[in-house]
UniProtKB/Swiss-Prot annotation:
Residues that, per the record, bind ATP: S110, Q111, S112, G113, T114, G115, K116, T117
Organism the protein comes from: Phaeosphaeria nodorum (strain SN15 / ATCC MYA-4574 / FGSC 10173) (Glume blotch fungus)
Catalytic function, reaction form: ATP + H2O = ADP + phosphate + H(+)
Coiled coil: none
The keyword Ribonucleoprotein belongs to this UniProt entry's keyword annotation: no
Predominant subcellular localization, coarse grouping: cytoplasm
Role: ATP-dependent RNA helicase associated with the nuclear pore complex and essential for mRNA export from the nucleus. May participate in a terminal step of mRNA export through the removal of proteins that accompany mRNA through the nucleopore complex. May also be involved in early transcription.
Residue ranges annotated for the Helicase ATP-binding domain, each copy included: 97-265
Identification of the protein by name: ATP-dependent RNA helicase DBP5
């Protein structure tokens, strides 16, 4: 399926802590466990400066090394400890602007898995005054899982900053009355808003507010309102930083109001998809055959780790029930689970105890598990109406694999004219090619996907990877 390919009829004719660090530290230019260097596909980050006095010719405007950023030795030690060797493209552009004094706001967009978390974490940690034992920075995320992951990265990166305190602000009935007095707080908008209103968070000294997956939070009426209320409860002169892989037009105007006079870093649509992710689709006769087709991929899914994305909680629960009943080991996570159960499931997945995770869009954004080599879109991502394609969610889903130079496979199931058209619309939006899988020989399908997964580097040319798929 290509962006220009005409619509065809398919064969025949539900809505949607620290333990994370070892997995999340691929969020920069580093080295994997085996010591071989990673590569980052070239892409262009467009920079729009709010402050016209900022000098693009200044050598610090584009930092080629972390040392150039004049970070403290404690922070540099933390960066090296996480195996970061040099800034990624987004870090190279964003960090000099984030670290300027006086601080300026930022709206930054970059591909999934390219170092956004490390960028805003370094900015947060660079501005913390350890002599003051009170909250100075808040980072918000749309899910507890992502909040815990970000907290782990910040804690690990700042491990050599003596006296640094970090805390999570996520739903927990046992800690509802706990005072949050750490230097850095990472949480979900609803919990942070409640704790601020109840004065369990002292806001006087907070100077940085970060929204990760900002477009997702600002675009949701409830969560967007919560983010706005959080900001209204903070000092007026705080630095506001918005990060995401996507900023659709409907959100960008609101983002500009939420973070006024921002430096803006953006990508074109066609630069958002990641070279190391091989995007495939499989045309299935009918919806009822999707489950049996999914089972054919179970062996491949368990060679490393895989995520199966579905549209509804009901589908997630049903897939888990059927697969477990047939002897397959899988885990399931959706918003229907209690917080502690969600923590248990994601920790099992990170540790490799569970290699296959069935989930809804609750985990489509930001979650970084290094071992994920395959993402399956059991349901094509759509808008709330279930009819219109959702390109941004597709991008975030497949971005759970192919993290920072690694290779991954994204496989989407289509089963009727509507789902085929939705996927075609997604391909057109990103101006990218999606390759069909020939299911006449399942042994050949398995061999082809194994070749892709076992590729040592995402730096293989598109031509080489396409030949693997089509040969």
């Amino acid at each position: 399926m290509s962006a220009t390919e005409p619509t065809k009829e398919p064969a025949k004719e539900e809505v949607a802590e620290q333990s994370t660090v070892a997995q999340a530290q691929v969020d920069g230019s580093g080295e994997p466990a085996n010591g071989s260097p990673l590569t980052e596909t070239e892409y262009k980050v467009e920079v729009k400066l709010a402050d016209m006095q900022a000098d693009p010719n200044n050598p610090l405007y584009s930092a080629q090394s972390f040392e150039e950023l004049q970070l403290s030795e404690e922070l540099l030690k933390g960066v090296r400890n996480m195996n970061f060797r040099k800034p990624s493209k987004i870090q190279e552009k964003a960090l000099p602007l984030l670290l300027m004094n006086p601080p300026t706001n930022m709206i930054a967009q970059s591909q999934s898995g390219t170092g956004k978390t490390a960028a805003f974490s370094l900015n947060i940690l660079s501005r913390i005054d350890l002599s003051r034992n009170e909250p100075q920075a808040i980072a918000l995320a749309p899910s507890r899982e992502l909040a815990r992951q970000i907290l782990g990265v910040i804690t690990h990166m700042g491990q050599f900053m003596e006296g640094l305190k970090t805390m999570a602000a996520i739903p927990d009935p046992t800690k509802r009355n706990q005072r949050l007095d750490a230097h850095v707080l990472v949480g979900t908008p609803g919990t942070v808003q409640e704790q601020l209103k109840r004065r369990l968070i002292k806001s006087d000294s907070i100077k940085i507010l970060v929204l990760d997956e900002a477009d997702n939070m600002l675009d949701q009426q409830g969560m967007g309102d919560q983010c706005t209320r959080v900001k209204s409860l903070l000092p007026k002169n705080i630095q506001t930083v918005l990060f995401s892989a996507t900023f659709p037009p409907a959100v960008i105007n609101y983002a500009n109001k939420f973070a006024p006079n921002s430096n803006v870093l953006t990508l074109a649509h066609e630069e958002l998809t990641i070279e190391g992710i091989k995007q495939l689709y499989i045309d299935i006769d009918k919806d009822q055959d999707k489950y049996s087709t999914l089972l054919k991929f179970y062996g491949l899914m368990t060679q490393a780790s895989s995520i199966i994305f579905v549209r509804t909680r009901r589908t997630a629960e049903e897939l888990e029930r059927r697969m477990v009943a047939e002897g397959h080991k899988v885990a399931q996570l959706s918003g229907a689970l209690e917080g502690q159960d969600r923590d248990r499931v994601i920790d099992q997945f990170r540790s490799g105890e569970a290699k296959v995770l069935i989930t809804t869009n609750v985990l489509a954004r930001g979650i970084d598990v290094e071992s994920v080599t395959m993402v399956i879109n059991y349901d094509v991502p759509t808008m709330a109406d279930g009819r219109e394609a959702d390109p941004e969610t597709y991008l975030h889903r497949i971005g759970r694999t192919g993290r920072f130079g690694r290779v991954g496979v994204a496989l989407t199931f289509v089963h009727d004219k509507a789902s085929w058209q939705q996927l075609h619309d997604i391909a057109s939006y990103f101006k990218t090619d999606l390759h069909p899988i020939d299911t006449s020989d399942w042994d050949n399908v398995e061999e082809m996907i194994q070749k892709i997964i076992k590729s040592s580097r995402a730096g293989k040319s598109t031509k080489e990877m396409t030949e693997m798929i089509t040969s």
